[in-house]
Swiss-Prot record:
This is GILT-like protein F37H8.5. PANTHER family: GAMMA-INTERFERON INDUCIBLE LYSOSOMAL THIOL REDUCTASE GILT, GAMMA-INTERFERON-INDUCIBLE LYSOSOMAL THIOL REDUCTASE. Residues 1-35 form the signal peptide. It is found in: Secreted.
């Protein structure tokens, strides 16, 4: 009987294919075991909406759909509690918030500055500031300037002034130099000056005091203090220097933020170089 057409594996090929089959079966069994044993309650909340399969398996889908609907193409609100002569506030404004966040994320965030910080409103209504009377005067000026700028961002000018103060430039000189450098118009200058000598200046300081006291759900413990979308958390403050990275993670829109794309490409490039060597 002719047996040349039997459907048998040749001796040289059979072990290879069997090994591949064993590996495939093992992978399927392992995947099933991982899926069966995953503890959804132990997954960090920041990862809940990062993968559709994860959302479906752990029951996160409904929450994630609501989150996406509420945040898609929406600017992220950043509120920063500051005080004028605080070195850490000056560093944050001049080295992080203005040169990195504002310049690269201006179309994706709303930035609000609250110049009051650790000051206290005394029983007689006067305000006592952590770094003395000069700080109170500058806080008041910054509040008036912010109000006078209306729809324009005060951050470039305030960052300029704070950088000058870091260099021990007199406040009046710093204001004049920065107004000239950033071409602040006469109307805004007059509005700011009028605010300083009127009841409005005091009202704005009291408003800043109330805004600082009423942050939620946790009170500020130091400055600068960063609040994201109205939420004040002590645990977040340790990540102030990672704010650009977090904004890249949090923002959800039709188009990626150019800064984030560039940062990701640079990261992959560095990783490729390391893996090559």
């Amino acid at each position: 009987m002719d047996t040349t057409c039997r459907c048998l594996l040749t001796p040289t090929i059979q072990p290879v294919l069997l090994k591949m089959l064993y590996r495939l079966v093992a992978a399927i069994l392992l995947l099933g075991a991982v899926q069966a044993t995953i503890n959804c309650a132990a997954i960090p909340t920041s990862l809940w909406c990062s993968n559709k399969d994860l959302e479906a398996k752990c029951g996160f889908a409904s929450f994630c759909d609501k989150h996406r609907a509420a945040t898609h193409n929406q600017k992220i609100n950043i509120t920063v509690l500051i005080e004028a002569l605080c070195p850490d506030c000056q560093n944050f404004l001049t080295k992080q918030l203005y040169p990195i966040v504002f310049k690269n994320f201006a179309n994706y965030v709303n930035i609000e500055l609250v110049p009051f910080g650790n000051a206290k409103v005394l029983e007689d209504g006067t305000i006592k500031c952590q770094h003395g009377e000069e700080e109170c005067s500058i806080n008041k000026f910054e509040g008036c300037f912010i109000d006078s700028m209306q729809d324009q961002s005060p951050l470039p000018t305030l960052s300029c002034i704070e950088e000058s103060l870091q260099k021990k430039v007199e406040f009046a000189d710093a204001v004049q130099q920065c107004f000239e450098k950033l071409q602040i118009g006469g109307d805004i200058q007059r509005l700011t000056q009028s605010c300083l000598v009127s009841k409005l200046g005091a009202d704005l300081q009291n408003k800043a005091a109330a805004a600082t006291a009423n942050v939620w759900p946790e009170q500020h413990k130091f400055v600068p203090w960063v609040i994201i979308n109205g939420v004040s958390l002590t645990s977040f403050q340790g990540f102030q220097n990672q704010l650009p990275t977090l904004l890249c993670e949090w923002y959800s829109g039709d188009k990626a933020i150019p800064y984030c794309e560039a940062a990701l490409k640079l990261k992959y490039k560095k990783a490729s170089i390391r893996s090559f060597f």
